[in-house]
Amino acid sequence: MTSAAVYDGLIKDILHAFKYHNATFYKAFLGKILFDELSKEEVACDIVSFVPLHWTRMIFRGYNQAALIARELSRLLGLELRFDVLRKSRRTLPQVGLGRALRKKNITGAFCASGVADRAVLVVDDVVTTGQTAREVSMALKKAGATRVVFASVGRMLI
């Protein structure tokens, strides 16, 4: 799992505005700092995807912040961005404010994947806290036949 920055200070403010206040103009900056971090290591992936939102949250927010970052990152990496490989199969509570045990219970079994057999997938998210979402997404992709899953986020909370 790779994260570009600790989730505090300016990065926290930018990600909060990006996610909750329609500040989508930050997408290029966020994609670039994640690209810069990933460029420090070998990221041998075939495709890029992102942590999906449930369709009801997508309608409410109007966009998926992870998808916007993934679009920028895929362009910089020269990799195909796939919107169809991950799906959130049920609604969950927002993870914000939940403790570790509730986060795990809340997100367990919430994702399904397809179209990734024999593919290495780079999955993008905005922030990682406990890593439970990353684990669940990785399990869904592996179950669908992905050979490798690399999880990358802009921010990483220190808990």
Which residues does each PLM region occupy?
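Conserved PRPP/pyrophosphate-binding segment of the phosphoribosyltransferase/PRPP-pathway fold
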Residues: 1-123, 130-159
